[in-house]
Amino acid sequence: MVKRKHLLGLQELSKEEINTILDIARPMRDIIMRDIKKVPTLRGKTVATLFYEPSTRTRSSFELAAKFLSADTLSINVSSSSVQKGESLIDTIRTLEAMGVEIIAVRHQQSGVPKFISLNTKMSVINAGDGFHEHPTQALLDLFTIKQKLYKIEGLKVAIIGDIYHSRVARSNIWGLLKLGAEVTVCGPPSLIPVEIEKLGVRVEINLQRTLEWADVVNVLRIQKERQDAGYLTTLDEYRDWYGLTQEKLEKLKGKKLLILHPGPLNRGVEIDDYVADSPNAVVNEQVTNGVAVRMAVLYLLAGGNESGNVD
């Protein structure tokens, strides 16, 4: 990772590179827990966020990560920028480059846009989510959270539940989990499971209760209403009955402990109920905190930081 200029996806990272990011995220999290959440590591650097899709968590997380490292930040509001006047993506990138931006986090509705930008700029590019392709920093924060809570990833049984077909979060998690030695099962309606996904090395299960009995960790994906409108689901109520993580389904496990993750935002009453979302086993808010730490680690490494993680 130290030698990489960009973070475009977990598919291209080695196990060692992933572990380097997770290791450096630990001291970054310590910084976040302090009263004074600031170190001078990236003073003089400029980090921009360019999001062509709505985002609260990811965008704010990148901006806070940069500020905690003392970088200057620039947030491009696409809805009120020159993009609305017809400015091309390349011209937008060249403008930011000319302004002195060194690192840019990009989210786009089309897969491959961060890669395209990386081939046409001197800036370091971070993929903040591209189409159905990847969302690497979300997967990294999920991995970090699992390791923080269970002290390991190798040998764990991790289930990803929900709309696998449209989920960049699922894809990045699959790459990362498999590289770190976890077993992975995907579970959801057959209409939302990609054909031949088993070729990646994952198991496919359509019965949620069997999946919960198998798993040590479950990552519950958000279900979007537009999937129902497009015919992938009959009703959200039916989805909740079959695949929603509920108190009733957990009680059938007879006290078995499950670590429960969710990338947010939660659709309470659809993919997860209030009882589960607010239970001690759910670590959604810790994921948010860890997301800032992981993104600090990524910014630090892309800016040329060493693997010791010594930032003070």
UniProtKB/Swiss-Prot annotation:
Q: Which InterPro entries match?
A: Asp/Orn_carbamoyltranf_P-bd (IPR006132), Asp/Orn_carbamoylTrfase (IPR006130), Asp/Orn_carbamoylTrfase_sf (IPR036901), Asp_carbamoyltransf (IPR002082), Asp_carbamoyltransf_Asp/Orn-bd (IPR006131)
* EC number(s) recorded for this UniProt protein: 2.1.3.2
The UniProt record gives the binding positions of L-aspartate as 85, 168, 222
BP GO terms, sorted:
'de novo' pyrimidine nucleobase biosynthetic process; 'de novo' UMP biosynthetic process; amino acid metabolic process
Q: Which reaction does it catalyse?
A: carbamoyl phosphate + L-aspartate = N-carbamoyl-L-aspartate + phosphate + H(+)
SUPFAM superfamilies cross-referenced by the UniProt entry: Aspartate/ornithine carbamoyltransferase
Amino acids binding carbamoyl phosphate: 57-58, 107, 135, 138, 264-265
Q: Which UniProt keywords apply?
A: Pyrimidine biosynthesis, Transferase
Q: Which GO terms describe its cellular component?
A: cytosol
Q: In which pathway does it act?
A: Pyrimidine metabolism; UMP biosynthesis via de novo pathway; (S)-dihydroorotate from bicarbonate: step 2/3
Does the entry feature the keyword Transferase, yes or no? yes
The record's GO molecular-function terms, alphabetically, read:
amino acid binding; aspartate carbamoyltransferase activity
- PANTHER family under this entry? ASPARTATE CARBAMOYLTRANSFERASE (PTHR45753:SF6), ORNITHINE CARBAMOYLTRANSFERASE, MITOCHONDRIAL (PTHR45753)
Q: Which HAMAP family match?
A: Asp_carb_tr
Its subunit composition reads: Heterododecamer (2C3:3R2) of six catalytic PyrB chains organized as two trimers (C3), and six regulatory PyrI chains organized as three dimers (R2).
**Protein function:** Catalyzes the condensation of carbamoyl phosphate and aspartate to form carbamoyl aspartate and inorganic phosphate, the committed step in the de novo pyrimidine nucleotide biosynthesis pathway.
State what protein this is by name: Aspartate carbamoyltransferase catalytic subunit
Q: Which organism is it from?
A: Carboxydothermus hydrogenoformans (strain ATCC BAA-161 / DSM 6008 / Z-2901)
Name of the gene encoding the protein in the UniProt record: pyrB
